[in-house]
């Protein structure tokens, strides 16, 4: 699932192909990986704050969240619980109203979200929020959010790096969802115990923080933008990989099992 698709959509696709995941038989959260995506974004944002701002907690941290969908709103909930001060915008006014009501967030317009004097800008809407029109408005020292393809071009990543803005690469930050999908598929394997799902999933999502720290450290040491280092780390892991697990088909009998663990 992603923007514009849902679990029912994926189930419909499963009538035509076995190459799908994120379905209701695989986890107690209905197969929707967005809870894991959101928690991974929270872990990533926390790691970025620790590295850049040398802070051990998020109390009083000012965060601007662009987009309050399935992932963005859950991220806002995690941040609110951690004591952060939230500034939010969304194209759906009801989502903004809910955040104001439930999370004591401050509502701003889509145009204002970029220029706020905040610690973190968390893009959680559609792609390319960092572009020619917005990059000079940013006052945040950290960019960490769930949106895909956050940099309109690589040049924008170079600009952020040159200005000392810590950019947490998008496909690392939002990896929680695909990690969840991996373990949902793995539960279909006869040699994997579904009882391990929650523990294994949580450990891997928390591990996103360690990956980001490696990227941040190498970026600073080499004076190379984080998005470049992220690609290098990914390539290194691909090249060094030896155990390529393949799941069974979703129409196998194992796919009909029910599971008691949830994310």
Positions of the model-derived regions?
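Hydrophobic alpha-helical scaffolding
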Residues: 3, 31, 65, 69, ...
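Glycine-rich phosphate/diphosphate-binding loop of Rossmann-like nucleotide-binding domains
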Residues: 32-120
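Adenosine-phosphate binding glycine-rich loop
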Residues: 141-260
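Short glycine/threonine-rich loop-to-helix capping motif typified by GTGT followed
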Residues: 70-77, 134-136, 157, 240-246
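Rossmann-like adenosine-cofactor binding region
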Residues: 60, 91-173
């Amino acid at each position: 699932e992603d923007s514009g698709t849902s679990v029912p959509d994926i189930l419909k696709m499963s009538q035509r192909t076995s190459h799908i995941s994120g379905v209701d038989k695989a986890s107690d959260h209905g197969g929707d990986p967005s809870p894991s995506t959101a928690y991974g974004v929270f872990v990533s944002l926390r790691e970025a704050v620790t590295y850049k701002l040398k802070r051990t907690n998020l109390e009083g941290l000012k965060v601007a969240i662009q987009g309050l969908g399935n992932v963005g709103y859950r991220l806002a909930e995690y941040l609110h619980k951690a004591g952060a001060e939230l500034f939010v915008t969304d194209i759906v006014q009801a989502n903004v109203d809910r955040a104001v009501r439930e999370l004591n967030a401050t509502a701003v317009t889509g145009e204002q979200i970029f220029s706020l004097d905040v610690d973190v800008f968390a893009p959680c809407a559609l792609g390319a929020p960092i572009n020619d029109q917005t990059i000079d408005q940013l006052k945040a020292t950290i960019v960490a959010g769930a949106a895909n393809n956050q940099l309109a071009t690589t040049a924008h990543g170079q600009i952020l790096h040159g200005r000392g803005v810590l950019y947490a690469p998008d496909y690392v930050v939002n990896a929680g969802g695909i990690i969840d999908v991996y373990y949902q598929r793995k539960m279909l394997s006869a040699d994997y115990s579904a009882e391990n799902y929650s523990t294994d999933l949580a450990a891997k999502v928390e591990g996103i923080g360690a990956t980001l720290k490696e990227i941040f450290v190498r970026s600073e040491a080499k004076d190379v933008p984080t998005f470049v280092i992220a690609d290098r780390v990914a390539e290194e892991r691909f090249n060094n990989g030896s155990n390529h697990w393949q799941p069974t088909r979703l129409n196998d009998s194992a796919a009909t099992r029910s599971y008691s663990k949830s994310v």
